[in-house]
Design a protein with these regions (language model features):
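C-terminal motif of bacterial Sec signal peptides marking the signal peptidase cleavage site
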Residues: 16-18
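Bacterial lipoprotein signal-peptidase II cleavage site
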Residues: 20-27
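Carboxylate/His-rich catalytic cores and anion/metal-binding grooves
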Residues: 242-263
Length: 521
């Protein structure tokens, strides 16, 4: 089975004709308590961070892919050598290209192409003056393990169950937050909101954040289903359902607990307080936040999307999810306000998902009213992107002119990203001041969607170049991906790891699913 292309045949013909330039208990049982020293010495030695002059993807390169190293320094040599790390033999000698002085970074930069090296192995690069690079691999399955590890991060973050070493390894832990929580606005009411994924080290769980992350994971599966298997190494593996859907279903089960069964209202989230003193007069440390319109719309978006994709595996469960999404939508309508501009994006995305899954005209009416607005679409908003992709991919009746408007926005954004990447030192928009990768990941989300529609080789190359950037071919010479590379992001900041960021990891999964699919074509 090949990837499920978004079918907009008439639209693509129109567009492509003109785009020749587009190349718990109160005290949880089983929790681990960590104690530190009573006093921490104030040691603040300034240790300079050393960055190599030869920058590579520290994980490695696919056998037949383009392989480029970036060189930087006060002076540039003429040639470089690729060394077999095991034997010490020189296996390739190349010449530096496109030497130039970078005024912004105050350094010389150059590039070395060693794409003809296709023998599997572990290597590093040496060059006079600049020294050596970190080591890297060449092989056909270089990205397989980080793809699985990125997906497994959500399993590691499961709340309410025991994670055994068989599946979680060093991330194993006892069941946590298994008791009931108190409703923050009325502490006489207790609720079972166990389960789901921890979103940070405190164990917080926010419905809108969860819905957005779930939707990106589901989009990955929708666009590239063949990239996902049923043997990822979680307890549900082997049940006939792709593990990515099993994992999202675990979060869906928690989301359903967050909905009031009588009214359809959706509580905004679960807050874990570090001390009882945070809320005067209250004794528990787990609280359910009050229901909100944003949470209800986000809930409706995620569960409708899940329902649509899960119906082929369990139609009854999918139908129940769709009904829950509809109830949340209707409850939100009762409490929305005219000044709720920020929440309109959630309403749009929820309506798009509900229209595709259920086909009701009321959903379509709102989606098309939103798309017809004069102010246009916010091309930098992830939730709006999710709604747009669903509208142009639905089998329900749509307006061609609105699909054209969406595609024009997507393709314009894709070309802007491409232009920036072409002129970037590291073939991305990354630079010396890069303190997080959220914008780059969002850019790749846009590019991945557009590439799925038109299959542009340049876009595929740019997506892979961003993966090279995240894996060490960047100005800091660090890998932002856990368990990949010699020089981890932890050397400059423990919060920068992509897999350790709840929402960022889902976008990494989307990138890797596209790359895995492109390698099969």
């Amino acid at each position: 089975m090949r990837k499920q292309k978004i079918m907009i045949v008439p639209l693509c013909v129109i567009l492509l004709a003109g785009c020749g330039q587009i190349p718990s208990e109160n005290i949880q049982s089983g929790e681990n308590n960590f104690n530190s020293m009573e006093e921490t010495p104030d040691l603040s030695y300034e240790v300079p961070v050393s960055t190599p002059g030869i920058l590579v993807n520290q994980l490695g390169y696919m056998t037949e892919s383009t392989k480029i190293a970036v060189f930087k320094g006060e002076e540039m040599p003429e040639e470089f050598h690729v060394i077999d790390a095991e034997s010490g033999d020189t296996v390739y000698t190349g010449f530096l290209e496109d030497k130039g002085y970078n005024q912004e970074l105050s350094e010389y930069n150059s590039y070395g192409d060693f794409s003809s090296l296709q023998t599997p192995g572990i290597y590093y690069i040496e060059a006079p003056v600049l020294g050596r690079s970190y080591s890297f691999s060449v092989g056909d399955q270089v990205y397989d393990e980080i793809f699985s590890e990125a997906c497994r991060q959500y399993y590691y973050n499961r709340c309410g169950i025991t994670l055994t070493t068989e599946y979680a390894g060093e991330n194993a832990h006892n069941a946590c937050h298994t008791g009931k929580a108190l409703l923050k606005e009325d502490t006489s009411i207790s609720l079972d909101v166990s389960g789901g994924w921890h979103q940070d080290e405190k164990g917080q769980k926010n419905v809108a954040v969860a819905a957005q992350t779930m939707s990106v994971m589901l989009l990955s599966y929708e666009l590239y289903p063949d990239s996902f298997t049923d043997d990822m190494g979680i307890p549900e593996s082997g049940n006939g359902v792709p593990d990515i859907l099993d994992e999202v279903k675990y979060e869906v089960e928690w989301m359903l607990k967050m909905q009031d069964q009588k009214t359809g209202a959706v509580y905004a989230g679960v807050t874990i307080y570090s001390s009882n003193g945070d809320i005067p007069g209250k004794t528990a440390d787990i609280y359910v936040e009050p229901a909100s319109v944003e949470a209800e719309r986000a809930f409706a978006m995620a569960l409708a999307k899940f329902s649509y994709l899960y119906q082929n595996f369990d139609n009854e469960y999918a139908t129940n999810c769709l009904k829950a999404a509809d109830r949340a939508w209707k409850h939100a309508l009762l409490y929305e306000t005219d000044k709720d501009d920020k929440g309109e994006k959630w309403k749009f995305a929820a309506a798009a998902e509900l229209y595709r899954a259920a086909g009701q005209g009321s959903y379509r009416k709102y989606v098309e009213e939103y798309l017809n607005r004069e102010e246009g679409l916010d091309e930098q908003d992830e939730v709006i992107l999710l709604g747009c992709v669903t509208y142009i991919s639905t089998k329900q009746t749509v307006k061609l002119e609105l699909c054209e408007k969406i595609m024009e926005m997507l393709m314009t954004r894709a070309e802007e990203i491409s232009d920036t990447a072409r002129s970037g030192i590291y073939f991305t928009a990354g630079n010396k001041e890069q303190n997080n990768n959220n914008q780059l990941l969002l850019d790749m989300m846009y590019l991945t969607v557009v590439n799925h529609v038109i299959t542009n080789h340049e876009y595929e190359t740019i997506i892979e170049n961003h993966l090279h950037y995240f894996l060490g071919r960047n100005d800091k010479g660090v890998s932002y991906v856990d368990k990949a590379g010699e020089n981890s992001y932890e050397s400059i900041g423990s919060s920068l790891g992509i897999m350790k960021q709840f929402d960022a990891d889902s976008k990494l999964i989307l990138m890797l699913s596209e790359i895995a699919d492109s390698l099969e074509r």
